[in-house]
């Protein structure tokens, strides 16, 4: 899982980009976590609790994206994926979920979060 962090020099916004199949992580980092160091630290602390066996799982529901953690992996997904459709879409018109959902190992997420924390902290 590759990623890159940038800061928009005009707006000061922190931006994260992740490799293919993990694009939604970039949106989650940029839009849900942003420069909130306390929120980033909270997720890091929860990961440690799960790794140590103090907790089995955890969910953080955000405005547009949510995070599910368990002993094995992390799932980041667009909240819109949870809505049931009342109608059938043609195959060519089906919703593309690959850019709206991603899975990664807890260690990979922890490493990326630590990097994001340091990047944001340096930029504030």
Curated annotation (Swiss-Prot):
Q: Which NCBIfam families match?
A: PRK05248.3-2
Which organism was this protein described from?
Shewanella oneidensis (strain ATCC 700550 / JCM 31522 / CIP 106686 / LMG 19005 / NCIMB 14063 / MR-1)
What InterPro entries does the record tag this protein with? UPF0231
Lineage of this protein's species? Bacteria, Pseudomonadati, Pseudomonadota, Gammaproteobacteria, Alteromonadales
Q: Which cysteines are cross-linked by disulfides?
A: none
Q: What is the protein name stated in its UniProt record? A: UPF0231 protein SO_3983
Instruction: Write down the superkingdom of origin.
Output: Bacteria
The record's listing under Pfam families reads: UPF0231
Protein family: Belongs to the UPF0231 family.
């Amino acid at each position: 899982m590759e990623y890159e962090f940038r800061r928009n020099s005009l707006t000061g916004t922190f931006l994260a980009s992740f490799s293919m199949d993990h694009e939604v992580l970039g949106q989650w980092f940029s839009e849900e976590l942003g420069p909130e160091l306390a929120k980033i630290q909270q997720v890091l602390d929860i990961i440690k609790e799960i790794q140590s066996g103090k907790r089995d799982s955890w969910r953080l529901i955000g405005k547009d994206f949510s995070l599910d953690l368990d002993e094995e992996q992390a799932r980041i997904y667009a909240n819109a994926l949870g809505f049931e459709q009342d109608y059938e879409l043609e195959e060519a018109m089906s919703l593309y979920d690959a850019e709206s959902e991603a899975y990664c190992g807890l260690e990979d997420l922890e490493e990326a979060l630590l990097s994001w924390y340091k990047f944001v902290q340096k930029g504030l």
